[in-house]
């Protein structure tokens, strides 16, 4: 299965009638493995800050997290495993696997819980597969 198939069929899937706004799978070096249409381009400093928060949980909380210059308030995730952010009526969930970062961005009517479920389910699967 290609990385694009994981994005198209497992991240951009219908969740109770709602779909993520955009999604992507990136390597820890920031390289894009696959992404949906409309996924924002991440700047190198933004990827570095996200990876730093996985290594030092809480480091993003004081300043917020930035995705393509848009600021997200960091909300409780799972230290070292999941980062969650909120911006207006939407937000982001980022799951870290051994080799990848799985991003899901959403807006209402999708809920944070639905986004978390979609992103974390794929992340857990990739971890089980050694990725």
Curated annotation (Swiss-Prot):
Gene Ontology terms for molecular function: actin monomer binding
Principal location listed in the UniProt entry: cytoplasm
Keyword terms of this UniProt record: Actin-binding, Allergen, Cytoplasm, Cytoskeleton, Disulfide bond
Matches recorded under SUPFAM superfamilies: Profilin (actin-binding protein) (SSF55770)
Cell location: Cytoplasm, Cytoskeleton
Disulfide feature: 13-115
Tissues of expression: Expressed in pollen (at protein level). Expressed in pollen.
GO terms under cellular component: cell cortex; cytoskeleton
Quaternary structure and interacting proteins, as annotated: Exists as monomer and tetramer. Occurs in many kinds of cells as a complex with monomeric actin in a 1:1 ratio.
Record PANTHER family: PROFILIN
Species the sequence originates in: Crocus sativus
Gene Ontology BP annotations: protein homotetramerization
Protein name: Profilin
Family membership noted in the UniProt record: Belongs to the profilin family.
Function: Binds to actin and affects the structure of the cytoskeleton. At high concentrations, profilin prevents the polymerization of actin, whereas it enhances it at low concentrations. By binding to PIP2, it inhibits the formation of IP3 and DG.
């Amino acid at each position: 299965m290609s990385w694009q198939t994981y994005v198209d069929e497992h991240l951009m899937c219908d969740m109770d009638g709602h779909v993520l706004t955009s999604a992507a799978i990136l390597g820890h070096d920031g390289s894009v493995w696959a992404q949906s249409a409309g996924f924002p381009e991440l700047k190198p400093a933004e990827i570095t800050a996200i990876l730093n928060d996985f290594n030092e949980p809480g480091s993003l909380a004081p300043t917020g997290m930035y995705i393509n210059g848009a600021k997200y308030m960091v909300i409780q995730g799972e230290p070292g495993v999941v980062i969650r952010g909120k911006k207006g009526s939407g937000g982001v969930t980022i799951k870290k696997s051994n080799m990848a970062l799985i991003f899901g961005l959403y807006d209402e009517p999708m809920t944070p819980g639905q986004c978390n479920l979609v992103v974390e389910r794929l992340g857990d699967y990739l971890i089980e597969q050694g990725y």
